[in-house]
Curated annotation (Swiss-Prot):
It catalyses: a pseudouridine in rRNA + S-adenosyl-L-methionine = an N(1)-methylpseudouridine in rRNA + S-adenosyl-L-homocysteine + H(+). Homodimer. Pfam families: EMG1 (PF03587). Its EC number is 2.1.1.-. The record marks 71 as: Stabilizes Arg-69. The record marks 69, 110, 113, 117 as: Interaction with substrate rRNA. This is Ribosomal RNA small subunit methyltransferase nep-1. It comes from Caenorhabditis elegans. GO terms for molecular function: rRNA (pseudouridine) methyltransferase activity; rRNA binding. S-adenosyl-L-methionine binds at residues 161, 188, 193, 206-211.
Length: 231
């Protein structure tokens, strides 16, 4: 099952631009904010700092290991890019690190299944500023200029996902089925705390219980798939 799932071809980028951006505006933009993704030279090699592997190193640097959770970004990207919504060509993903590095993720990017391989890829991304497909020159991930609002559709509705707000919106009610416009959802790629941004129009929650970033990603993509009839 997993082998078959992993071999499903991702959407074609050129077709997506023609079919979706020009004809169908029903696209979900997800921005993962505050993601922990920081490199340092540990044991003679550059590595993505992680609370599990580098707790002693971080304490020596007088940093809290609990703030270094790149696994959250890994889980979120797996949920987003593996989703039927992405395979249908109706998802765009950006993430911004706690160091204010903004990254554009291609819908065709295949996220490594293992965390170690993911970290290796992220070291390459932060040092070379892009990741290219092995067989082509296509960029699968690239560092782009801030602000993120320059990369989002003009006039789009931008909602910040937050548990600490009274408004509750079911994931399958985030947009009306007949609404022909893109939606931007901002999700904190953090383990604790609150994300504060200056480009959202509103704040909402999709559950009466606190959700992890990865579960939030899974629920919103599932909700939009239901709204837009993607099976």
């Amino acid at each position: 099952m997993s082998h078959e799932y992993d071999t499903v071809a991702p959407p074609n980028a050129k077709r997506m631009k023609t079919d979706n951006q020009l004809e169908d505006k029903k696209i979900l933009y997800v921005v993962l904010e505050g993601c922990s993704l920081e490199t340092a030279k540990v044991g003679g090699e550059y590595a993505i700092l992680s609370s599990d592997k580098h707790a002693n190193f971080l304490r020596k640097q007088k940093k809290d290991p609990a703030d270094y959770r790149p696994d959250i970004l890994h889980q979120c990207l797996l949920n987003l890019l593996d989703s039927p919504l992405n395979r249908a060509g109706k998802l765009r993903v950006f993430f911004r690190t706690s160091k204010n590095v903004l990254v554009d993720v291609s819908p065709q990017c295949r996220i490594p299944r293992t965390f170690d391989r993911f970290c290796g890829l992220m070291v390459q991304l932060l040092h070379k500023l892009s990741i290219r497909a092995a067989e082509t020159t296509q960029k699968l991930m690239s560092v782009v200029k801030n602000p993120v609002s320059n990369h989002l559709p003009v006039g789009s509705r931008k909602m910040l996902m937050s548990f600490n707000v009274p408004e509750l919106t079911m994931a399958n009610k985030l947009v009306a089925p007949e609404t022909d416009e893109p939606l931007v959802l901002i999700i904190g790629g953090i383990a604790r705390g609150k994300i504060v941004v200056d480009y959202n129009d509103s704040e909402t929650k999709i559950s009466n219980y606190p959700l992890s970033a990865a579960l939030t990603c899974a629920k919103v993509t599932s909700g939009l798939e239901e709204i837009w009839g993607i099976i």
